[in-house]
Structures are given as structure tokens and as C-alpha cells.
Regions:
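Bacterial N-terminal signal peptides
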Residues: 10-21
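Universal eukaryotic N-terminal targeting presequences
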Residues: 1-2, 26
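Contiguous, well-folded functional domains in the mature portion of proteins
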Residues: 30-443
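Bacterial N-terminal signal peptides that target proteins for export
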Residues: 2-11
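Signal peptide processing junction and immediate N-terminal pro/mature segment
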Residues: 22-31
Length: 443
């Protein structure tokens, strides 16, 4: 009898211990869920690999925790800053990699689709983009843990995990298409694009094709002096390249004028990478321009000039945000300052060099932020003759930028008219792909 009582007591104690452990784990899991975000997901590769980075690099873990703490001081509101501890970041990473781009952050906070995507994309970078005193002498693009290895490399793994979801059929439903059809910013009612029947994932929609050439008519198709825009985008301006191949990157400023990154010099050699080293000197004393694609733009890019392809290659890099993210307290929005130069040289990018009657031209599509995959049409190879307006490639989801380099003798001049300045606009109007972008005034 005593033995039976002992066994019963022991069994009850075991159940109590197991229940206590289960409750503790449930509480810990709940603590990892950012306020306002419901997550019923298990551990994913995104958070598992990040946790390993933290365990194996205790010094970096301290810096990450400091970055999160610094962010919580700048914006303590959990509605717009739900992650305020490292444990909460683990949960947030798991949550985001199976999310649609417009619902990572609480939807009621923002109005337009573009703003929802923008804030959702920028948020995780903002957490890791806080300037830290300990990193100021590390010669990073910006003294934040975003650019510190192994986090810099981990970001690509995180982004690829999300890309796998956006490539899958689970990322596309009729309700998503209906929602996008109702949003006028996408212009899906104008007959510009292929049939929606061709879209079986979000990325197939995002990299949608035109229905026909008339959707984006080519400006002056028989006049090779006219350079057309490579993409639907916002031109950011023109920069002169000096005799040593360097161009001056202006200081990066917030909208209130506060400088968040000092001016720097960047070289053509850095931008073209090692595969393009033999062509770099052609662009010394040349001209650079770049143009920004927003989320709701058509995300295929086309040749801006006619000629013969000399080289085509990719430069694999990490998926950094494409500038510097800061919190605008007045607007209650995360803002990406990407109008300036220099960040393109630390991003994944492609490059196509084209020999034209006006000298060599380099077209450099640049991925920005999450899942900005740079892809070329398979038929584009050295020796291929191309006409301006021909399709060159496409981006998958994320922000994107197109850089163009021209030789000095080309006399390239930007001809796009002025527009309202603010946000991602540098003061030029939005242009459509294959619309006139500039002209060659030299020979």
C-alpha cells in the first residue's frame, strides 16, 4: 500500500513538473511574439540561423541587443516598433518569412498598399541599422550591425527564406489579386500586362510581363541618340565621374537636414566589380545616373540603348537595405534615404556592358532589401545585338535601382522633366520604361 502511494505521489510530481515546464515554454514563446502581431508558427531557418550567430558570437549579440534597445528609445510605441528584445526578434523573423509583403506590420497603421509594403520591408532593417559608437572605426558602409559580418551575410539567408515563400503557390490567392485590382496605383485595369492567369505566385505577379510592345512604346526607335528609361522609375539625377574613376557621393541627410552619413568617394571599379575591371577606365571622366523603382512599378528592365553586348555578369553581394533607414517622428514612418550614391557598391547587382556608336554603356540593375533578385534573360550573351527597348531582365520582390554609366565622349544629358521632390523622388517626374530618359550630344 505504501509502495502504491509512493508511486502515485511520484507520478503526480512528474506531471506537475512537466506542466510547469510546458507553461514556462508557452510563456517564453508568447514573450517572443511582438505586440499586435499574432504568430502561430514554429521555428524557421531564418531565426534558427540568427540564433546560432548570436550564440557563436557573444560580442555581436551584445551589439544587436544594444541596437534593439537604441531603437526602442527612439520609437517606444509597440504599434510601430513591436520588437524590443532579442527574443522578440527571433519570433518576428519566424513570422515574417511566411507573410505577404503588405501585412508584416499591423495593417491599420497605414493607408496605401505601397506604404504598408514600405514599412513592412524597412522595419527589420531599421532594428539593425542603428549607428553604434563601437562600430564607427570599422570602415563599414554605415556603423550598424546590418553591415557587420556575419549578420551582413545572414541577411541574404533570411531574405532567401522569404523569397522561397513568395515563389510558392501559397503566396498567391484570388483575394490577393482582387485586392491589387482595386488599388489604382498598380494600374492593373489599363491592359498593360499579361493575363493574370499566368500568375501562380506573388513573385510571378511582381515580375509580370507586358501584354505587348504598345504598353510601353519606344521613344524615337530609329534615333540612337535618344536613350530610353530602362524601367518604370524615378530618376535620381546625374553625377560626373572624375579622371581617376571616382564619383562624389553627397552626404546622406534626413528630411529635416540632419546628416546621417558623411560624403564619400566611390569608384567605378567598385561599382563594376572584378568582372568589369577591364572596362572601368572607359568611364573615367564619364557620367553616372541612377533611377529608382518603387514596389508598384513594372519590375522588368529593358535596354536603354542599341548596340552589341560586350559582357554580362552578376556580382553576388548581401541584401542590405539600399541606403539608410531612420524613424521620422513627425510622420510616424520609417524612411529610407536612398537618393544618394555609394550604397549600390555593397548590394547584389548585375551588369551588362553594351558597345554603342556613342561609346561603351554599362547598365547595372541593383537589388535593394528583401528578396531583390537580379535576373537576366537567358538569351543575353556577349556578341548579342540589341535594340533599345528590348527586354533585359527582371527583379523579384523588393526595392530596386538601375544605374547607368556613360563614357564622357558620349555627351549624355538627362532630359527627364522636373517633378515634385520628396519621399523617393529626387525632383524628377516618374518615367515609364522605354520613355525618353536622356540624349547623347557627343560622338
Amino acid at each position: 500500500m505504501k509502495r502504491k502511494n509512493f508511486v502515485a505521489i511520484w507520478f503526480c510530481a512528474l506531471l506537475l513538473a512537466m506542466s510547469t515546464l510546458w507553461i514556462s515554454e508557452a510563456i517564453a514563446a508568447q514573450a517572443e511574439q511582438p505586440s499586435g502581431i499574432s504568430m502561430a508558427v514554429g521555428r524557421t531557418k531564418a531565426s534558427t540561423s540568427f540564433r546560432e550567430v548570436m550564440i557563436n558570437n557573444p560580442d555581436i549579440r551584445i551589439l544587436v541587443e544594444k541596437s534593439i534597445k537604441q531603437a526602442s528609445i527612439i520609437n517606444p510605441d509597440r504599434k510601430t516598433n513591436p520588437v524590443q528584445s532579442l527574443d522578440e526578434l527571433y519570433g518576428f523573423l519566424d513570422y515574417t518569412v511566411t507573410c505577404m509583403p503588405w501585412n508584416i506590420m499591423p495593417e491599420e497603421q497605414y493607408g496605401s498598399f505601397s506604404t504598408k509594403c514600405d514599412q513592412s520591408i524597412l522595419y527589420v532593417y531599421w532594428l539593425l541599422d542603428q549607428p553604434l559608437e563601437e562600430l564607427k572605426d570599422k570602415e563599414l558602409f554605415y556603423p550598424s550591425v546590418e553591415y557587420l559580418e556575419p549578420i551582413y551575410t545572414w541577411l541574404t539567408e533570411y531574405n532567401n527564406t522569404w523569397r522561397d515563400f513568395l515563389d510558392s503557390e501559397a503566396s498567391w490567392k484570388q483575394e490577393y489579386l482582387d485586392m491589387l485590382l482595386r488599388d489604382p496605383s498598380w494600374n492593373l485595369d489599363k491592359g498593360w500586362y499579361e493575363s493574370p492567369d499566368n500568375w501562380h505566385s506573388f513573385n510571378e505577379f511582381f515580375s509580370r510581363k507586358l501584354s505587348n510592345g504598345n504598353s510601353r512604346p519606344i521613344a524615337e526607335p530609329n534615333d540612337d541618340r535618344v536613350v530610353v528609361s530602362p524601367a518604370d522609375s524615378l530618376p535620381q539625377g546625374v553625377w560626373n565621374i572624375d579622371e581617376s574613376g571616382r564619383f562624389y557621393a553627397d552626404p546622406i541627410k534626413r528630411e529635416d537636414g540632419v546628416i546621417i552619413k558623411d560624403s564619400t568617394f566611390v569608384s567605378v571599379e567598385q561599382l563594376l566589380g572584378e568582372p568589369g575591371a577591364e572596362y572601368a577606365k572607359l568611364f573615367h571622366n564619364g557620367i553616372l545616373t541612377h533611377t529608382y523603382l518603387n514596389y508598384d512599378d513594372y519590375h522588368r528592365y529593358h535596354f536603354p540603348v542599341s548596340g552589341v553586348v560586350e559582357a554580362v555578369y552578376k556580382i553576388p553581394y548581401a541584401n542590405a537595405v539600399g541606403g539608410i533607414v531612420y524613424w521620422d517622428k513627425n510622420k510616424e514612418l520609417y524612411v529610407l534615404e536612398s537618393n544618394s550614391l555609394s550604397w549600390q557598391s555593397v548590394e547584389t547587382r548585375g551588369c551588362v556592358l553594351i558597345k554603342t556608336d556613342y561609346g561603351m554603356v554599362a547598365v547595372i540593375p541593383v537589388g535593394m532589401g528583401q528578396v531583390s533578385s537580379v535576373n537576366f534573360i537567358e538569351t543575353i550573351k556577349p556578341g548579342t545585338k540589341v535594340k533599345k527597348g528590348d527586354e533585359l531582365g527582371y527583379f523579384l520582390f523588393g526595392g530596386s535601382d538601375c544605374v547607368m554609366l556613360f563614357e564622357g565622349k558620349s555627351g549624355f544629358k538627362l532630359s527627364v522633366g522636373k517633378g515634385e521632390k520628396g519621399g523617393y523622388s529626387a525632383g524628377y517626374r516618374h518615367v515609364f520604361c522605354r520613355e525618353e530618359y536622356g540624349r547623347f550630344l557627343g560622338k
